[in-house]
From Swiss-Prot:
InterPro entries: CcmE, CcmE-like_sf, NA-bd_OB-fold. Keywords: Cell inner membrane, Cell membrane, Cytochrome c-type biogenesis, Heme, Iron, Membrane, Metal-binding, Signal-anchor, Transmembrane, Transmembrane helix. One of its GO terms (biological process) is cytochrome complex assembly. Heme binds at H123, Y127. It is a single-pass type II membrane protein. GO terms for molecular function: heme binding; metal ion binding. The keyword Metal-binding applies. It is found in: Cell inner membrane. This is Cytochrome c-type biogenesis protein CcmE 1. The keyword Transmembrane helix applies. PANTHER family: CYTOCHROME C-TYPE BIOGENESIS PROTEIN CCME HOMOLOG, MITOCHONDRIAL.
């Protein structure tokens, strides 16, 4: 009698373990496209990512680099004070997008140019994404907003 109970308990434990491993695998598979790592321009210049890798870049839109091209194509550079990365984006920019303002872009780094598929701009004059703020502090160019 006890051996039957023990055998049933082992079967339940094995089944639960298999279900847990399967669920973890499915969650990881579903999230594979949703995970985008953040990189500062200095990180990109130091170690350029593969052209197939999608990631986020953040920093300040470099002054004097914003050029509107044909149609909705926009070119500009993003800097963290230590390095600058050229960006090309085709689409409608957020209303708050401007030079010397914080931004985060999602896309790929191909042939020395970040090809953005999405651009996010800061919310107001005091907001800056944490990753961008940390990168600017690391470069020594971050200035805290005056209250």
């Amino acid at each position: 009698m006890k051996s039957l109970k023990k055998q049933r308990r082992i079967q339940v434990i094995i089944l639960a373990t298999v279900a847990l491993v399967l669920a973890t695998g499915l969650i990881g598979y579903a999230m594979r496209d949703g995970i985008n790592f953040f990189r500062a321009p200095s990180d990109i210049i130091a170690e350029p990512p593969q052209p197939s890798e999608t990631f986020r870049i953040g920093g300040l839109v470099e002054d004097g680099t914003l050029v509107r091209g044909q149609g909705e194509t926009v070119r500009f550079s993003v800097t963290d004070g230590g390095a600058s990365v050229p960006v090309v984006f085709t689409g409608v920019l957020p209303d708050l997008f401007a030079e010397n303002q914080g931004m985060i872009g999602t896309g790929r780094y191909v042939n020395g140019v970040f090809e953005a598929s999405e651009i996010l701009a800061k919310h107001d004059e005091t907001y800056m994404p944490k990753e961008v703020m940390d990168a600017l502090k690391e470069q020594g160019v971050y200035q805290a907003p005056e209250s």
